């Protein structure tokens, strides 16, 4: 088994019972794949598939002018490389994007040419089409300097859907069926029955019209319409009555209205008897072809065809007319014998289309189309062209209507066709097929669709959403181009004169900047980043809205299995509308979610893995991942629990066709990080998965002792750690950079065999948490590709580490852990276990105002020297300065408007100069309630403005760092080259050289070492071939030096050019403060099982409950928090964590007494290989075993995978191994070793009962009391009501609401009440009066009129009631 560099250092013991069949796929794959399909940047222009940008271009181009003599064709497009890299874009507030240029061809045809079109001239040119934001390697976008994520959207798939209203519309509870054809873009077409069973259609939810209008509009006559929907009864008219052609199945179940006889007149069915199967058999036996029926049997039936008099050509009766006695008379007169009527019955053949035809007043195709035109464009005159154009544009035009590949596939599948491809517009037979199925449904045949089935909902990813926006922009451009193409020839225009890229740029900018699906990335910790990118939302443009979404859409559906997580979704109004992808889920080419299954053949599980979509899955019998199998992969049990079409049942193994790949298949990343998830109630698991995303990265991350084994995947895929691109040897490491000399076999010939990784140091995340990377390799370490070189925020040795492992005791403690409060030991705070660093960005801009430019300077009058002490000569604070609320960070003055001066002031000005008074101090100060250390300053200066010293110094430092990187690369390149050179030169014969090297001498190592390396090139060799390769090496080194000089020059140019700043801004300074937040009462904390609480007290270490050996607990939780919430997983985690730490202490004790390596090996084998997944400890050298043991002293990390975790028995074994009987007895443990005797820290007395004690991974959440604490003395007031504003952001007051007023009223505190309602709220004169009184030392309140009373008076007046105050 292969262990990576970091895995070797600390193996996580897994309790999984099942081997890993299928690796967890790369977690950000959906985002990255979708966007690369959209761009197709690395694909040669000729080989691009018709998707993404290519599809958008080809769908809009060629653009033809109105007269048809000029057209603009699209050839190909290209993306330039971005001007700034990701980091520079973040610092400068720019968008990380690339310029899109399209090569287009303008073709002008000769108007004079009499016969077929002749090309007059062709112009080809590259045209700038706007900027396209690029995705970073971690799946986010940098827009205006901030990282954003485009969330995937789950929307209704295009296609056709049949449903009914569940009996809610009509009071009788009758089911009203409806169908809807949804295109990808274009008009929606709905069909619906009304309570009278007449079928209507509507376009885009407009007025409804009888469906036969649409059928006539597509060219069907009433006869053809009836022929499409009904079967006919054939009658032959006799002198008396008629003969009915006998069709057995149409008679069954009917009541005979007359005696039915056979040929010989024998009665087979008596009158008023129901016809049953025996009667029909008798009729068939009698070889009945016709049945004689009386005249009245025909009355009320409906004719199927027009009946025409053969002689005169007169229409006697039309199709869909009822047969009446007069009609029969006319028929007999005209001598017509054979007539056809519609066969209908009340059970399964209703007369719906026939009755609809009756309601329909249109006569022919033209009239029908005019009716549709009136409905779509009321008020417009229906000219022939307009009517035709509108009807064709609705469903038949490729520009306006697109069913899309998905829509066509879904449509054909639903109407039962075999082929899944076809035209992208609607066809006549599509409309007919839909109506037929709808009528069948009304007749009681077939099933309606389930809209919440994942086969009917598809995911639109970044690429597709961006493509739609881009196409929208292109369509806007197309309109403008069409206008100008007419003038192209006469004015000799080039393609770039025709195309204006503004509409495209603005469409793209609007989408990435302000669309509902483009969200500010949640960057609190690595897990929140991953989860945000894997999120699937039903909201957004073209999706649902919170208010309209009902219960069904939000609910968990059987098809979510393995595709969408049933647990992770937000609490509150968005519940169920925002979901997370399951661990193994993947999108197919149509955008439907698929999940992998193992193929089972003849009850034997094979290695073949198939991805099935929700529709395909419904056809198979699928076993769960925990089904028992033997070594050969055969299913052992007689009955296996399995699913088919969403139902769970027990079946025999031979019926199983597929099996789940892993037990964790059904949950998302966040939920699969919860150990013992299977023992938690789902509601609490939901809170647990949501709260892990809010965990603040601690100063020293600590791996969870009880994990699930997915932590490493999570940390590595999130991109917060640094991974090696290529294997090699670590050449140099410091806190900020790692240099790796690449292995020869991985280096590409001719390129620098050096990888330099610059680490991110103390950078602010979107949520103001700190992102900092720390190297975990040493010089000389051998690393291979993909190994973790540096830990990021919240990762520890390449594993996700969101919190800290705390020793937790479940017991009450003097009411301090009442109602989920948390009691914490002072030691936790003293050890900085939960200390986190938050970085605040403060910026100030110097603008050019009407009265002159603002200036950033140290020279500010009327500020004490103390306040300016931390500023340098440019007026900007030093890095490293510790500042508090109100301190000046950047000095800035703004010119003030000239005021009318008194003569005295004029005199003073004339004497002392005028600088002092005409500017006001607008410096950047630290906001209230904030303090910290300045860790970075950035200065941006507009092009053409003199840089100050500070800005210049920042640029020089940056260049120095870059030069260092280049020198390292050069050093390694030259080192390699000279090593190769030495190997080549030693033993060669020389013709001469430096230091008087005689001709014919053999070169040896000593001679080379004596020379300076560069003089080696002066050696003249006898061997021509060797001389040539000497020259080649010299040239390659010089070439590299030249390249490095160019790169440095490029960097210098980039840094020294002016910065792009918003209009009117001359200079911008950003100051970054690092704020240290220690744990304090009021902070919110939580475990991973939804067990959240607020710190109530931090207790001195001596007062905490302690064990017999004197070790105190870290955290005391209330045991009452467990039973009612049913999250028992936390108790199991505590037991297993106790064992993990116990094993660590035993390993530590062995290392301390310097036990033999063999003893360590035996103990480790006992831990790792006696249960759960086996580890290959044999392959470890003694040194590696020793390093592993050293890393395990703080606890052996366990992995208990979701739904496949540690059993009670395994936990028992681990506890026995960790606490031998002598230690257990000393600590006063119970027989199962999971409870301990504790002593009260304040009295020293032993508690009566043993206490559950152990280690739990506990998190500090991003709800810190520091961010919420707020106090106000005087502050801003609302304009109308004159009451103080609310909230911390507005520096507002506390609301004294209705109920609080009642409390004072009930108490009778009239004086306090008056003060609250007047001077402390909105009595304007009163509040100034109070201030005056206080200054005078007179403590009385003169309460006046509250402003809100005036507002009330004004409101009453607005109703037209004159109300006035009698002020006497």
Swiss-Prot record:
<protein>
    <recommendedName>
        <fullName>DNA-directed RNA polymerase subunit beta</fullName>
        <ecNumber>2.7.7.6</ecNumber>
    </recommendedName>
</protein>
<dbReference type="InterPro" id="IPR007645">
    <property type="entry name" value="RNA_pol_Rpb2_3"/>
</dbReference>
<dbReference type="GO" id="GO:0003899">
    <property type="term" value="F:DNA-directed RNA polymerase activity"/>
</dbReference>
<dbReference type="Pfam" id="PF04561">
    <property type="entry name" value="RNA_pol_Rpb2_2"/>
</dbReference>
<dbReference type="GO" id="GO:0000428">
    <property type="term" value="C:DNA-directed RNA polymerase complex"/>
</dbReference>
<dbReference type="Pfam" id="PF04560">
    <property type="entry name" value="RNA_pol_Rpb2_7"/>
</dbReference>
<comment type="similarity">
    <text>Belongs to the RNA polymerase beta chain family.</text>
</comment>
<comment type="subunit">
    <text>The RNAP catalytic core consists of 2 alpha, 1 beta, 1 beta' and 1 omega subunit. When a sigma factor is associated with the core the holoenzyme is formed, which can initiate transcription.</text>
</comment>
<dbReference type="Pfam" id="PF10385">
    <property type="entry name" value="RNA_pol_Rpb2_45"/>
</dbReference>
<keyword id="KW-0804">Transcription</keyword>
<dbReference type="InterPro" id="IPR010243">
    <property type="entry name" value="RNA_pol_bsu_bac"/>
</dbReference>
<dbReference type="GO" id="GO:0006351">
    <property type="term" value="P:DNA-templated transcription"/>
</dbReference>
<dbReference type="GO" id="GO:0003677">
    <property type="term" value="F:DNA binding"/>
</dbReference>
<keyword id="KW-0548">Nucleotidyltransferase</keyword>
<dbReference type="Pfam" id="PF00562">
    <property type="entry name" value="RNA_pol_Rpb2_6"/>
</dbReference>
<keyword id="KW-0808">Transferase</keyword>
<dbReference type="InterPro" id="IPR037033">
    <property type="entry name" value="DNA-dir_RNAP_su2_hyb_sf"/>
</dbReference>
<dbReference type="InterPro" id="IPR007641">
    <property type="entry name" value="RNA_pol_Rpb2_7"/>
</dbReference>
<dbReference type="InterPro" id="IPR007121">
    <property type="entry name" value="RNA_pol_bsu_CS"/>
</dbReference>
<dbReference type="Pfam" id="PF04565">
    <property type="entry name" value="RNA_pol_Rpb2_3"/>
</dbReference>
<dbReference type="GO" id="GO:0032549">
    <property type="term" value="F:ribonucleoside binding"/>
</dbReference>
<dbReference type="InterPro" id="IPR015712">
    <property type="entry name" value="DNA-dir_RNA_pol_su2"/>
</dbReference>
<keyword id="KW-0240">DNA-directed RNA polymerase</keyword>
<dbReference type="InterPro" id="IPR007642">
    <property type="entry name" value="RNA_pol_Rpb2_2"/>
</dbReference>
<comment type="function">
    <text>DNA-dependent RNA polymerase catalyzes the transcription of DNA into RNA using the four ribonucleoside triphosphates as substrates.</text>
</comment>
<dbReference type="InterPro" id="IPR014724">
    <property type="entry name" value="RNA_pol_RPB2_OB-fold"/>
</dbReference>
<dbReference type="InterPro" id="IPR042107">
    <property type="entry name" value="DNA-dir_RNA_pol_bsu_ext_1_sf"/>
</dbReference>
<dbReference type="InterPro" id="IPR007644">
    <property type="entry name" value="RNA_pol_bsu_protrusion"/>
</dbReference>
<dbReference type="Pfam" id="PF04563">
    <property type="entry name" value="RNA_pol_Rpb2_1"/>
</dbReference>
<dbReference type="InterPro" id="IPR037034">
    <property type="entry name" value="RNA_pol_Rpb2_2_sf"/>
</dbReference>
<dbReference type="InterPro" id="IPR007120">
    <property type="entry name" value="DNA-dir_RNAP_su2_dom"/>
</dbReference>
<dbReference type="InterPro" id="IPR019462">
    <property type="entry name" value="DNA-dir_RNA_pol_bsu_external_1"/>
</dbReference>
